[in-house]
Amino acid sequence: MKKLAKMISIATLGACAFSAHALDGKLVPNEGVLVSVGQDVDSVNDYSSAMSTTPAGVTNYVGIVNLDGLASNADAGAGRNNVVELANLYPTSALIVGVSMNGQIQNVAQGQYNANIDTLIQTLGELDRPVYLRWAYEVDGPWNGHNTEDLKQSFRNVYQRIRELGYGDNISMIWQVASYCPTAPGQLSSWWPGDDVVDWVGLSYFAPQDCNWDRVNEAAQWARSHNKPLFINESSPQRYQLADRTYSSDPAKGTNRQSKTEQQIWSEWFAPYFQFMEDNKDILKGFTYINADWDSQWRWAAPYNEGYWGDSRVQVLPYIKQQWQDTLENPKFINHSSDLFAKLGYVADGGDNGGDNGGDNGGDNGGDNGGDNGGTEPPENCQDDFNFNYVSDQEIEVYHVDKGWSAGWNYVCLNDYCLPGNKSNGAFRKTFNAVLGQDYKLTFKVEDRYGQGQQILDRNITFTTQVCN
């Protein structure tokens, strides 16, 4: 069935509710559709500022070979990626992360990058929020250079490793197809790694009209037939220049651009987009809209060596902006809220970690220090509020005493490997693997709205057997 044949008005769409349906996956909302925005740090920030909103979900990317974009800036011409920074900026938003194989899918499947996979999983898992992992995103996209067997093996490996490391409740795995019109139909089964290792089916939605919505419909039906929730992981009105109010039917170079009114742009791309969601309301549980000036990013800019994309920023046209806001006000869409994580089926682990650390540190360290030191002042090296405790010859606890910061988020870092700290005994703490006697750089980052917005503190130490706090 062609989706345009069932077009209804936005007013009618707004009156319909997305029905509850028991789907087989992780971090799936019982009711509603998660609204997320991408896909680079600065575009997300611009959207949040222009729309005066905190996105319920934010999207970014990591390369598996060098973990570029995980905890440092990486820009391959498509906007800046820095997952940890994005997590810092939006500590109460869900995180959607695309992982590129960098053309190395065979080596990934054979285990060459297992250490990087562990670092990725641990970093994401410790962010204490729902994380949706788009492993080898657009699995069947010919530009990615994947092969079916290594793709499936790597998917199974990562799914299992997430559970071995204890993050099965934190990280949900998305199998995302490209929904690319030139792709032949009937190929999805060859890329499918198995119902037991897929939490969500994802798709891309750019110019589905080029093939009469056949590829996105095929992906949706695949999700339905496997009882999996559906996530539109990449979507943007490709070839529309919203700022200029133009459209080109030329996907390669964007030639012969036609002028469009704001109303035409909405009715041609946005209305069918939301209609697709309505038509698949039994399985559709999340979408990411890429709100970016593609033309300003050199990878997508003239001479358009990777095709013509345009400008998809909804805030640049008053009518589009208002329609977008009005549509997302419908309660079927899951926007940012204080109970967002609960709606997504996520239970924060801060209480558990805080309880464990608080109990161990408060009981063991408090008792040991009080008894051993006989009530005297702690050793001189323990006077610094930013310090460490010996846990074992292979483990160090890094901590910073709470100075009354607002602390909506905080990160404790060892040699620039940063994880959210757990507050206990009046300090923010995190335990890391380390080697006794080695030198390390400690970093502490914390939100400080009462001061200058944030505080970042560094110090260098030698790991000894000291126990301070």
Curated annotation (Swiss-Prot):
Optimum pH is 7.0-7.5. Stable from pH 5.0-11.0. Retains 65% and 70% of activity respectively when incubated at pH 4.0 and 12.0 for 24 hours. Coiled coil: none annotated. Residues 1-22 form the signal peptide. Residues 23-293 form the GH26 domain. The keyword Disulfide bond applies. It catalyses: Random hydrolysis of (1->3)-beta-D-glycosidic linkages in (1->3)-beta-D-xylans. The active site is at 138 (proton donor), 234 (nucleophile). Induction: By beta-1,3-xylan. Optimum temperature is 40 degrees Celsius. Stable below 40 degrees Celsius. Loses 70% and 99% of activity respectively when incubated for 10 minutes at 50 and 60 degrees Celsius. Residues 352-374 have a biased composition (Gly residues). Its EC number is 3.2.1.32. One of its GO terms (molecular function) is mannan endo-1,4-beta-mannosidase activity. Keywords: Carbohydrate metabolism, Cellulose degradation, Disulfide bond, Glycosidase, Hydrolase, Polysaccharide degradation, Signal, Xylan degradation. PROSITE patterns: GH26 (PS51764). Disulfide bonds join 382-468, 413-418. Residues 352-380 are annotated as: Disordered. GO terms for biological process: cellulose catabolic process; substituted mannan metabolic process; xylan catabolic process. It holds the Pfam family AlcCBM31. The keyword Signal applies. Completely inhibited by CuCl(2), FeCl(3), HgCl(2) and N-bromosuccinimide. Moderately inhibited by AgCl, AlCl(3), Pb(CH(3)COO)(2) and dithiothreitol. BaCl(2), CaCl(2), KCl, MgCl(2), MnCl(2), NaCl, ZnCl(2), ethylenediaminetetraacetic acid, N-ethylmaleimide, iodoacetic acid and p-chloromercuribenzoic acid have little or no effect on activity. Transmembrane segments: none annotated. Catalyzes the hydrolysis of beta-1,3-xylan into oligosaccharides, mainly xylotriose and xylobiose with smaller amounts of xylotetraose, xylose, xylopentaose and xylohexaose. Does not hydrolyze xylobiose, p-nitrophenyl-beta-xyloside, beta-1,4-xylan, carboxymethylcellulose, curdlan, glucomannan or beta-1,4-mannan. Belongs to the glycosyl hydrolase 26 family. The carbohydrate binding module (CBM) binds to insoluble beta-1,3-xylan, but not to insoluble beta-1,4-xylan, beta-1,4-glucan, beta-1,4-mannan, curdlan, chitin, or soluble polysaccharides. This is Beta-1,3-xylanase. It comes from Alcaligenes sp. The gene is txyA.
